[in-house]
Amino acid sequence: MSNSTQHWIAQRGTALQGSLTIPGDKSVSHRAVMFAALADGTSKIDGFLEGEDTRSTAAIFAQLGVRIETPSASQRIVHGVGVDGLQPPQGPLDCGNAGTGMRLLAGVLAAQRFDSVLVGDASLSKRPMRRVTDPLAQMGARIETESDGTPPLRVHGGQALQGITFASPVASAQVKSAVLLAGLYATGETSVSEPHPTRDYTERMLSAFGVEIAFSPGQARLRGGQRLRATDIAVPADFSSAAFFIVAASIIPGSDVTLRAVGLNPRRTGLLAALRLMGADIVEDNHAEHGGEPVADLRVRYAPLRGAQIPEALVPDMIDEFPALFVAAAAARGDTVVSGAAELRVKESDRLAAMATGLRALGIVVDEKPDGATIHGGTLGSGVIESHGDHRIAMAFAIAGQLSTGTVQVNDVANVATSFPGFDSLAQGAGFGLSARP
């Protein structure tokens, strides 16, 4: 079954059982191919996510003159050209749906000697980019956006960049990463501070590639002029993808699943803390480290959940997992309150509105507010859901269908392939009632 089908029909299946291997982490895969391309020497990447977003990033570096081999779907061998070895592209660089790819590439391309244009699909073309282009402009970059600050990004090369001390107004790992990557090319030191700590994939991986970088929660700094050394990277399983099965096993009676070698970056796992507040039964085992990233097996067993107030401090550490959390909240006894999550309105869709509207269509009472919502737990009924082409909305309602009193039709599911190719077949094998329709 292909994720490119038009819609899914989700309905009650069986309890989830057994051991599951989740595809590689999207955030780590993006950075691995990017940093390997900028390194001196050849790097091997194992566990690479073969999704549309990550393929877009790899294809862009091929357009920039980097040779990338594909021995298997989950492997890449990248022949790095060094920080100063990228070549002018022959046309626009298409990021597809990948906000990570576009924002991080803006930081790299701002320092090149040539001009370039970054474009994206209809969803990415609506997303805010001034949060990246403004600090890059402070460093001396010249990047043009549309009048409303959206893509395409027209990057003018040949600019001399200066290091800056940047206090980011938003808690965004993508913004931080773009500034740090530009900082590699800048004169002097570049430092970034954040209102709340965000994921530190960039900092950890730059360190793995030999860059001297100082970082702690909410702070990072590096000096310009450094080079990257090739290294091999083992990409852990993607926590954001695992999140859908973590929630499903938590709310489907009788479930007991183990998810293998899941990335547990401490700035990524807010969902685990939130679900544990709600009474979830989640046990970590076999802790290890892959490419600077902590990993572990997660055993998740069904447990009756109760509503909870989600601490705002957890929000940056679970920003991509809120669609799954909303489904857990709908299945819980009592009310779950989410605040401080306005960033959800500028993701691949307005996720607050999309989840609130979808849950209401299934009979759940949701009080929406500008930066969050209160979800009143209840019984999930039948309905038709518009995913708005957002992969995480689509997968969240595939879970909701597992507790539905009838069927849930989830429309516009093609973009699931951007982050989780094979989601539907893996879900079916685990026990989901899920079928594809044209």
Swiss-Prot record:
Gene Ontology CC: one annotated term: cytoplasm
Catalytic class of the enzyme: transferase
Subcellular location: Cytoplasm
SUPFAM superfamilies per UniProt: EPT/RTPC-like
Keyword Thylakoid part of the UniProt annotation: no
Binding site for phosphoenolpyruvate: 26, 99, 127, 174, 351, 392
Keywords: Amino-acid biosynthesis, Aromatic amino acid biosynthesis, Cytoplasm, Transferase
Active site: 320
PANTHER family according to UniProt: AROM/DEHYDROQUINATE SYNTHASE, PENTAFUNCTIONAL AROM POLYPEPTIDE
Protein name: 3-phosphoshikimate 1-carboxyvinyltransferase
Organism: Xanthomonas campestris pv. campestris (strain B100)
Native organism taxonomy: Bacteria, Pseudomonadati, Pseudomonadota, Gammaproteobacteria, Lysobacterales
Gene name for this UniProt entry: aroA
